């Protein structure tokens, strides 16, 4: 029995069953929009010189569904490219156990052991040097590829920053970022036949920074250690919402002295009618 084919069959079956179950229970399933974008990105790898195209940069705003697009892309590669799901790795430039936990919850069991943050990449460093036919997703790539951190160093030592090596071993790297300036500048040093850039347009129902600015929901930061700034916050809330009760979160500085002054100011400015908690 071919173990790779078995892994593919298990993955595809579990993926499709999981998506069906989540849609029926209105859980976190992959949307048609995310599947559509994943197919576009997958197709970009095979438009021209497909044997040389080994890198893709996905640019998308924060919290607009990048994880769903990655899930859909893994499905496309396993279904259409004969990729062993055990050869799919998902990394982040962040040092965050919480990110790993949340990401694993979104993926099929067979891929979960291959999800790492930057300080745990050493667990599969040897695999990076020898595996072929591999797909690597790099989230927060502007951090991940810095040579001073673990991911950058391991990529360098494993030959994954060498284009010829990537082509020979059939390794594709898909980078994801909402702030791609550094990644783009590095990418443009490569031959254009080796990469593609996919800029994901946010769906109409996406609420990002620009929409918050347009709706007058973002204000200049001012120190809450100044009681006049706390009074300004209260006035702004009352003008905008009147007696329509809402929850408002005020972030307090971690500095003990500043936090004490801030909480004292809040106590002095807001009265019992505001029903505030400190």
Q: Model-derived features: where do they sit?
A:
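Conserved pre-motif I regulatory segment
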Residues: 10-59
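Conserved Walker A/P-loop ATP-binding site and its immediately adjacent core
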Residues: 62, 66-74, 85-108, 182-184, ...
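Conserved RecA-like helicase motor-core motifs
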Residues: 86-87, 91-92, 111-119, 249, ...
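A short beta-strand-to-loop transition that corresponds to the Sensor-1 phosphate-sensing loop
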Residues: 94-95, 117-121, 140, 175-181, ...
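Conserved helix-turn-beta segment of the N-terminal RecA-like "Helicase ATP-binding" lobe
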Residues: 96-117, 190-195
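Conserved RecA-like ASCE ATPase "motif II neighborhood" in helicase/translocase motors
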Residues: 106-165, 278
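Post-DEXD/H (motif II) to motif III coupling segment of the RecA-like Helicase ATP-binding lobe
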Residues: 147-205
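Conserved interdomain linker/interface between the two RecA-like ATPase lobes of SF2 helicase motors
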Residues: 185-264
């Amino acid at each position: 029995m071919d173990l790779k084919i078995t892994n593919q069959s298990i993955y595809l079956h579990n993926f499709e069953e999981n998506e069906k179950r989540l849609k029926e229970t209105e859980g976190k399933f992959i949307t048609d929009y995310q599947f559509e974008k994943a197919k576009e990105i997958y197709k970009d790898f095979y438009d021209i010189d497909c044997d040389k195209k080994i890198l893709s940069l996905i640019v998308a705003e924060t919290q607009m569904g990048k994880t769903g697009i990655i899930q859909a892309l893994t499905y496309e590669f396993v279904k259409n490219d004969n990729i062993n799901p055990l050869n799919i790795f998902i990394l982040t430039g962040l040092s965050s156990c919480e990110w790993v936990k949340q990401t694993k919850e979104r993926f099929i069991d067979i891929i979960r052991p291959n999800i790492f943050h930057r300080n745990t990449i050493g667990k599969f460093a040897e695999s990076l040097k020898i595996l072929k036919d591999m797909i690597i997703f790099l989230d927060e790539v502007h951090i991940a590829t810095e040579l001073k951190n673990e991911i950058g160093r391991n990529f360098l030592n494993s030959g994954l920053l060498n284009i010829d090596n990537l082509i020979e071993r059939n390794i594709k790297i898909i980078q994801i970022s909402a702030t791609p300036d550094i990644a783009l500048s590095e990418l443009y040093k490569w031959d254009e036949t080796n990469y593609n850039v996919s800029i994901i347009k946010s769906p109409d129902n996406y609420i990002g920074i620009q929409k918050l600015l347009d709706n007058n929901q973002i204000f200049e930061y001012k120190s809450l250690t100044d009681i006049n700034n706390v009074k300004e916050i209260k006035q702004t809330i009352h003008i905008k919402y009147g007696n329509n009760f809402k929850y408002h979160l005020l972030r307090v500085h971690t500095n003990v002295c500043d936090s004490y002054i801030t909480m004292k100011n809040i106590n002095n400015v807001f009265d019992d009618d505001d029903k505030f908690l400190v």
